[in-house]
Amino acid sequence: MPGQDTRPPPPRKKLARRPGFGFAEAAMTSNRVFRWSGVTGLALLMGTAANCSAQTNADAADAALRAGRHFLAVPVYSAEDDQRVLKLFEGLRVADVCDGMDKAGLQNIGLMDPDIRPLWKDAREFKHRVVGIAVTARYVPTQDPPAGARDAASFNRWMGDWYGRKSSEPFVPLLRPGSVLVIEEHGHDVGSIGSNNILSWKRRGCVGVVSSATARDTDEIIAEGVPLYFKHPGRGIRPGRNEIESVNAPIVCGGVLVKPGDVVVADGDGVIVVPRGRAEEVAAYARATLLEDKAARTRLYEQLGLPKDKSVD
C-alpha cells in the first residue's frame, strides 16, 4: 500500500545472562521484567522453600527445648521381667551387691550417701531389708505463697486444692508388686511421706520407700513395719511447701542417679542402686560373695557354739 513501511523489523537484541542467575533481563519502558528460566529458576525456588522450612524446624526445635526436655532415655520393663530380675537379687545384702558392682567395674557407682538410713531395723528377721525395682518421683520447693491465716474450712479447701493440683501422687498407678518408691526432694521440714500414704503404697505392692529428704508420723510407720530409708523426720504438710515436678524420670537421690527400672537394695548398711542393664552380671557376682560369706560364718558359728540365725540359714 502506498506509504506503508515495508522494511523488515529490526532483530531482537539478545539479552546477556548474569552469572549465577537463572533469569534474563529485558528493558521495557522504565520497568525491569524478569523471565524465569526452567531448571535454574525452579532450583532457586526450591532452595528458598528449603531455607524457610529449615528455619521453621529450627524455631520449633528451639521452642521445644525452651519448654524443657529430658535427655536420658527411660526404658520400660514388663512386670514379668521385673520379677525375673528380683529373683536374682533375692536375699542379697548391700555388702554383697557393693562387691558385685566392684567386680563388674562399677566401683563407687550407685552407693547412696550414708546419711540415708533405715527408720527402723529388725535384727532377727531382717524385715527392714529391701530389694525392689525403682519407681521415681521428684518434688521441688514451691514458689507460691502459703495459705496465710484462714478459718478451718477455708484452710481445708486450700489444702485439698494444693494436694490435687500441685503436690499430688501421680506415681501411685505405677506401683506394683516389687516396686521401691524412690523420691528426690529437697525440703528440710516437710513430711511428704506419712503413715497413711505409705500404707496405701504398700497395698499396691510397694516393698519400701527411699527418700533424699524427710518423713513424718515416724512412730506409726515403725509400728506398721513399712521399710523406709530417709534422712530425718519432717513435720510439715506438702501444701505450701513443695510441688510434684516429675514421675518416672531419672532423679538424683542420695547423690546417685536413679532411673526407673533400676534395682534398689537397702539394709542396715544403707542403699545401693544397680543400673538395670548390668543387673544380671552384678547379681551373679553378689550371689557368689554371699555364699562364700555364709559358708565361712557358718563354720565360725559351729566352732563358737552359736545357734544359727537367719543370716546363715
Q: PLM features: what roles do these ranges have?
A:
Residues 163-164, 169-212:
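Extracellular/luminal Protease-associated
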Residues 57-171, 180, 301-305:
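Intrinsically disordered, low-complexity regions enriched in acidic/Ser/Thr/Pro/Gln residues
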Residues 231-309:
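Acidic, glycine-rich flexible loop/linker segments
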Residues 37-48:
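Bacterial N-terminal signal peptides
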Residues 108-110, 133-136, 146, 179-182, ...:
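Structural motif
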